[in-house]
Amino acid sequence: MSKEIENKYLIINDGYVAMSISSHHIRQGYLSRDPDRTVRVRIYDDKGYLTVKGRNSGDIRLEFEYEVPITDAEEMLALCPPPVIDKTRYIVPFGGFTWEVDIFEHPVKMETAEIELPASDTVYELPPFVGQNVTGDPHYYNSNLGE
């Protein structure tokens, strides 16, 4: 069992671009958007993943992720009801942590940054490109985009 502890913020400027060490293209869809158990199919550059997530409890939830053959991921993505999400992810090291900045192109235009933490009470510094904390707000869950 794996627990995901993360915080999500809105982006207020493009300072993340100069600070990033890499960027990646991501396409993802949801076989299940049930809040108790989301099932996501993701193509991350040229690799496929299947992820099952439990219900959000603030900043903590169960997460199980498995690499799958890219051809399987493409076929599963075709089974996902619309919308399929298209985004670019920037990897940004800051303050001893790795921030993931997602720039969504489809189905909505949006920019968010996430940080995964070892514990809910972990103290961390905010990078200069983040604004409002939207952790736990269902409007910003990837599984709810475009609905």
State the predicted function of each range.
Residues M1-E147:
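Phosphate-end processing signature that detects enzymes handling 5′-triphosphorylated RNA
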